[in-house]
């Protein structure tokens, strides 16, 4: 027997700015349940030039953002967008620490799209690793990113498979992109038991003692010297704190936590 039910809130998720992720295929979306609260989740919310027109076109009442970015958030507010922070939430059954009976398999790992405009620091990381691969005995692991053409992402490790590689790596290089925002890697890596090396997003100073900082404008020599210090064990305390941080994230940034927070956010307007 089919149960008849009526929603009390509409939540629509957009991944990014490409057309395949921004077209709502629900017929008469703006005419259905017009009296219900409408929430919009836009994961790549740094693409405000796409998010703002979508928000207004489909008459959303609130934009749920995955991260804080002071300058960007002010722009949204000045454009009449009502924002709230939901956050990123990671599958802790897949991204987790695993026992390494033989120790770390890799000394340092790099993964993600290599692009000079979008990820200038990651490009420098890649160039430094090429140099170190020739000049040192470090066990370097690079997971090439095939690009974003159709079917390409199926060729690279994801979820549990990716977490296992991270877990096998003592250090993992991360960057906040040219937008200097918090990305999922800043959670995936510590949750999988590796210590991050990279820049700290300006709106997240609390990461300072939980990762090894390399500023976004660092030159190649600075990157090399910082990596050298890592293997001279100058950051042992940071490694310990990173592990504690990863365990904390597995309890506070898992899917159940995300579900509970989303309920809390939506209940505020439903019960208003």
Positions of predicted regions on the chain:
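C-terminal "capping" alpha-helix adjacent to the active site of nucleotide-linked donor transferases
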Residues: 218-236
């Amino acid at each position: 027997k089919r149960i008849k039910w009526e929603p009390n809130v509409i939540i629509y998720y957009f991944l990014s700015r490409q057309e395949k992720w921004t077209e709502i295929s629900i017929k008469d979306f703006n005419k259905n349940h017009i009296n219900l609260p409408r929430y919009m989740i836009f994961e790549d919310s740094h693409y405000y030039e796409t998010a703002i027109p979508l928000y207004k076109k489909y008459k959303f009442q609130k934009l749920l953002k995955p991260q804080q970015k002071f300058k960007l958030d002010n722009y949204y507010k000045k454009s009449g967008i009502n924002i709230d922070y939901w956050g990123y939430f990671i599958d802790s059954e897949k991204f987790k620490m695993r026992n390494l009976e033989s120790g770390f398999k890799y000394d340092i790992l790099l993964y993600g799209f290599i692009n000079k405009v979008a990820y200038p620091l990651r490009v420098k990381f890649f160039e430094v690793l090429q140099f170190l691969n020739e000049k040192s005995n470090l066990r370097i692991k690079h997971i090439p990113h095939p690009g974003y053409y159709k079917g390409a992402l199926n060729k690279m490790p994801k979820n549990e498979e990716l977490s296992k590689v991270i877990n096998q790596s003592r250090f993992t290089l991360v960057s906040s992109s040219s937008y200097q925002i918090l990305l999922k890697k800043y959670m995936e890596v510590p949750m999988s038991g590796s210590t991050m090396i990279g820049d700290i997003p300006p709106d997240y100073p609390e990461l300072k003692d939980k990762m090894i900082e390399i500023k976004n404008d660092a030159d190649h020599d600075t990157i090399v010297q910082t990596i050298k210090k890592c293997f001279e064990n100058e950051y042992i305390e940071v490694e310990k704190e990173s592990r504690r941080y990863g365990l904390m994230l597995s309890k506070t940034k898992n899917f159940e936590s995300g579900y509970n927070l989303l309920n809390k956010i939506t209940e505020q307007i439903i019960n208003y």
